[in-house]
Amino acid sequence: SREIIKTNVDKETGDAVRKLELPGVKVDEDYKRYYPYGSLASKVLGFTGGDNQGVIGLEVQYDAYLKGTNGKILTMTDARGVEMENGAEDRIEPVAGNDLRISLDMEIQQYAEQLAYQTLEKKNAKKVSIIVMNPQNGEIYAMVNVPEFDLNDPFTPDQNLRSESLRNQAAERDKTVKQQELLNAMWRNTCINDTYEPGSTFKIITAAAGLEEGVVKLTDPFSCPGFRVVEDRRIRCHKAGGHGAEDFTKALENSCNPALMEMGLRMGVDRFYQCFSDYGLLSLTGIDIPGEAGTIMHKLDKIGA
C-alpha cells in the first residue's frame, strides 16, 4: 500500500529527501501556480491552494474552467500491489485547463495601485480602494484594494494587520488571534465585499433623475440659505451661510445639499424610488467575483417625503 507522508514541500526539501535514497520512499513532483506579478490585483485574481484548487477571486470563480483534468496510467498489479511485468497498460491523457481573458488593464492597474499606496501613506489610512470602469459596458480596467498581498505567499498575514488585530482583541481572555481571521481580512476585496454610503456622489443620481423626470431644467433657480429643515432635522449645507442664489448647473457644481434635496422632493417618493430601480441601485451588479455585497438602499415603505 501507499501512504502519503507530506504534501506541498518545497523543491529544496524534495531534493534533500531524494539524496538520502531511502528504500521505499519516493518524491513525486507536482505543479503549482506561479504569479509573475506578485501582489498585482491580488484580491481580484485570487490564488490556488495546496491541491491547486481556487481559494478566492477569479481563481475560485472559474476553478472548474481553469484546472483541466489529470492524466492517468492504469496498470495491472499482483495481490501485493507490485506492478506485473507484462501486464496490460492503459493510458488516459491529461486535458489542459482553459485560458481566461479578463478586462483588467495591467498598466492602469499598476498606476492605480501606485496612487493608492501613495494615498495610504499620505493619509495614514488603513486601506484604500480604487475602481476604474468603462461606463459604457461595465468592464473593469482596474480594481485596487491596498494593501494587496503576495499571491505567491498568500498564507503569511500582513504584519500591520496582525498588529491591528492584536490591539483590537487586547480585552479578550486569551489575547490570541486566529490565523484564519487574519487571512480572511487580508484577502477581503473591499470593492466587492463591503458596502459604503455614497455621500455626495449620489447627487449625480438625484440630478439625472430630476432631469429625466422633467421636474427640473438646467436654468431652474434655487436658493441655498445654508440648511433645510426636514421633519425635526436641520440638514446643513457644507458651506456655512449657504450658496445663496444659484441655478441647476451651479447647484450641482457646488454640491449644494438644499438644492439637491429640493430636486428629490419635486419627484416625490414613488418616482424617485423608481429611478433607483431603473438605475440598477436595488440589485447586484452580477460581477463575476464571489461575495458581492447587497444594496444598503432603504425599502420604499421606509422612505418619507
Which stretches of residues belong to each language-model region?
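Conserved, well-ordered alpha-helix/loop/beta-strand core segments that scaffold catalytic motifs
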Residues: 2, 85-128
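Extracytoplasmic/secreted envelope proteins and their assembly/folding machinery
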Residues: 14, 18, 41-45, 55, ...
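Short, glycine-anchored, charge-dense loop/turn motifs used at functional sites
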Residues: 112, 130-141
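Short N-terminal helix-loop-first-beta-strand/juxtamembrane motif that initiates sensory/input modules
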Residues: 23-27, 121-135
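Extracellular/periplasmic catalytic domains that process cell-envelope and extracellular macromolecules
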Residues: 35-38, 93-94, 123-124, 134-135, ...
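Short, small/polar residue-rich loop motifs at catalytic or cofactor-binding pockets
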Residues: 70, 124-127, 196
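Beta-lactam-recognizing serine transpeptidase/beta-lactamase-like catalytic domain environment
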Residues: 78-88, 104, 136-201, 205-305
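Small/polar-residue-rich segments within soluble enzyme cores
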Residues: 1-97
